[in-house]
């Protein structure tokens, strides 16, 4: 499908003053996550014809062309202009999102994983109705009932543990600070920031999940307003839960995330600011 016109994109941006951006990689056309991504992009009520969605995709040519031709989202081939891995693709997508016609310094740039189809609804119906003019960053908080019901049970417990750990670290680090922040759902994934804070994400060079979260820590340390109190009734796709629950590979993936990501976040509270 062809990209929407600049005027159409501008109208979509200004409707909610937001842009969703994400990145993707699918090894083949049978990947369950590719189908979930298309659900995200093509939802009739909350998809790319309602909200501008930027996706930077690093899939093989056949998969990339399939994705691009089956949605009205703004699908770009990853150029690796901003580094390697998920982090580089995230920064590339953020830069494109910030460059869309109609965006201003206060426009919300909303990151989410492409497979989190229900998050589009949450942005429009829950987050954008509750954010405040003084908010700089939003870290949505999952409703616990929805979280526990829709996620693989192992992921529910690992992410709850990780959140408690990272919030304990944050409270300790802010004890003697003039800055404060409510508990954050660190391991959820989706977050949003005003376009004026784009530099916090572009200047951090992490290549994985740290590229999402370290800039949030930097923002807290610099005194920006982080709203982590907006609760969302997000439900993970049932097909993903069925694929992952009880799978040793996915259980070990969650364990590796805790052992790799969380220590990086802890360390950055003490490291010099990069920005």
Where are these regions (language model features)?
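Short, well-formed alpha-helical segments that are part of the catalytic scaffolds
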Residues: 3-9, 22-46, 59-62
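C-terminal catalytic/acceptor-binding lobe
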Residues: 13, 209, 213-275
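Acidic donor-binding segment of Leloir-type glycosyltransferases
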Residues: 39-77
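Glycine-rich, basic loop-to-helix element that forms the pyrophosphate-binding segment
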Residues: 80-99
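Short beta-strand-to-loop acidic/aromatic patch adjacent to the donor-nucleotide binding site
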Residues: 104-117
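Conserved donor-nucleotide/metal-binding helix-loop-beta segment in metal-dependent transferases, i.e.
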Residues: 117-148
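Short, flexible, basic/aromatic active-site loop/helix in glycosyltransferases
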Residues: 136-184
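Conserved nucleotide-sugar donor-binding
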Residues: 162-163, 186-202
């Amino acid at each position: 499908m062809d990209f929407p016109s600049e005027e159409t994109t501008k109208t979509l941006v200004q409707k909610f003053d937001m842009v969703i951006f994400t990145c993707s990689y699918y090894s083949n056309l049978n990947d369950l996550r590719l189908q979930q991504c298309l659900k995200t992009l093509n939802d009739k009520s909350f998809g790319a014809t309602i909200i501008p969605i930027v996706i930077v995709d690093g899939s093989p040519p056949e998969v990339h062309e399939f994705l691009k031709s089956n949605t009205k989202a703004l699908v770009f081939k990853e150029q690796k202009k901003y580094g390697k891995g998920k982090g580089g693709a995230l920064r590339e997508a953020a830069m494109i999102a910030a460059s869309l016609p109609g965006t201003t310094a206060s426009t919300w740039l909303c990151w989410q994983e492409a497979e989190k189809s229900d998050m589009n609804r949450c942005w429009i119906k829950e987050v954008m109705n509750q954010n405040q003019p003084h908010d700089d960053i939003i870290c949505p908080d999952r409703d616990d009932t929805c979280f526990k019901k829709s996620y693989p049970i192992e992921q529910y417990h690992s992410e709850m543990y990780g959140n408690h750990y990272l919030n304990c670290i944050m409270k300790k680090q802010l004890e003697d600070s003039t800055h404060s922040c409510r508990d954050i759902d660190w391991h959820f994934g989706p977050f949003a920031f005003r376009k004026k804070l784009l530099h916090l994400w572009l200047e951090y060079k992490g290549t994985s999940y740290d590229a999402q979260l370290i800039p949030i820590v930097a923002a807290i340390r610099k005194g920006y307003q982080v709203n982590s109190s907006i609760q969302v009734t997000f439900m993970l796709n049932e097909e993903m839960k069925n694929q992952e629950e009880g799978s040793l590979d996915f259980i070990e993936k969650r364990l590796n995330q805790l052992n790799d990501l969380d220590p990086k976040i802890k360390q950055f509270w003490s490291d010099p600011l990069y920005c």
